[in-house]
């Protein structure tokens, strides 16, 4: 098995009733630390994520490994952070390693209650030291042909971000035209140029913008001003999008998570 994808036993989806709704959560984990790296809170984050009962969890800035942190912080997990968060609740997980450094590496991850039958990490790094990727997973959801999930964490630089959004658009154009697609994560798009670059059409929408008329404010977590995190859907409908802005969420990362019910 690919070491950067995981699966624990699951019942055959062919025997399961058709799934029409998926609970989706996206959260920038800030590598398991509070804002400004003041405190290691991965165990508390796991409990909060579990409490949402999400079917699919999109994670950004999650550590695959970090030797120095493992030696320094009591309670550091013996597994990768995404495996620790998945625990026994999400049977399948996939990881896209983006940034690699002497002590370890981090990237995006997807946790799923349904089988991940295929995944790939598309390198969308432009130039310089900043490494970015799009983690594309194909899910085997009962009653559906296939559901595509793309976990996103884009550049801090506007020029890089625009090129990465164009690559995301090309990825979307390569997928089956009628397939349900969920795109979620940290777009770092504080200028709100993403919709124009993606070329939103009737079959592609951003959940918060459709329901509330504007994108969600998610950063910084304690006093959210910037609209950085998004949930886009194609060939699926959104219902009840929420910003998880209360405690404990406001104290578990520098970003606030987003939760959306996706109707297939």
Short names for language-model regions:
Residues 1-88, 100-105, 166, 264:
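N-terminal, active-site-proximal structural segment of metallo-dependent hydrolase catalytic domains
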Residues 13-24, 106-108, 112-117, 130-151, ...:
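Beta-strand-turn-beta hairpins that frame and shape the catalytic cleft
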Residues 90-124:
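Catalytic-core segment of enzymes that process non-peptidic bonds
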């Amino acid at each position: 098995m690919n070491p950067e994808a995981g699966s624990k036993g699951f019942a055959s989806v062919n025997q399961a009733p058709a799934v029409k709704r998926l609970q989706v959560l996206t959260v920038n984990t800030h590598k398991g630390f509070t804002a400004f790296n003041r405190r290691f809170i991965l165990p508390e984050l796991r409990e909060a994520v579990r409490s949402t009962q999400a079917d699919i969890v999109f994670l950004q800035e999650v550590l695959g490994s970090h030797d120095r942190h493992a030696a320094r912080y009591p309670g550091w997990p013996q597994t990768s952070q995404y495996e620790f968060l998945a625990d026994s609740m999400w049977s399948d997980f996939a990881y896209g390693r983006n940034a690699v450094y002497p002590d370890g590496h981090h990237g995006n991850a997807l946790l799923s209650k349904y089988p991940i039958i295929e995944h790939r990490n598309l390198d969308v790094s432009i130039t310089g030291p900043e490494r970015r990727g799009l983690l594309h997973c194909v899910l085997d959801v009962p009653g559906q042909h296939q559901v595509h999930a793309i976990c996103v964490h884009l550049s801090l630089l506007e020029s890089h971000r625009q090129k990465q959004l164009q690559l995301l658009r090309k990825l979307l154009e390569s997928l089956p035209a009628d397939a349900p697609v969920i795109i979620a994560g940290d777009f770092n798009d504080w200028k709100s140029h993403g919709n124009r670059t993606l070329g939103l059409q009737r079959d592609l929408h951003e959940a918060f913008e459709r329901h509330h008329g504007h994108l969600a404010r998610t950063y910084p977590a304690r006093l959210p001003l910037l609209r950085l995190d998004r949930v886009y859907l194609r060939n699926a409908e959104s219902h009840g999008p929420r910003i998880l802005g209360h405690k404990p969420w406001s104290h578990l990362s520098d970003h606030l998570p987003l939760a959306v019910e996706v109707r297939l």
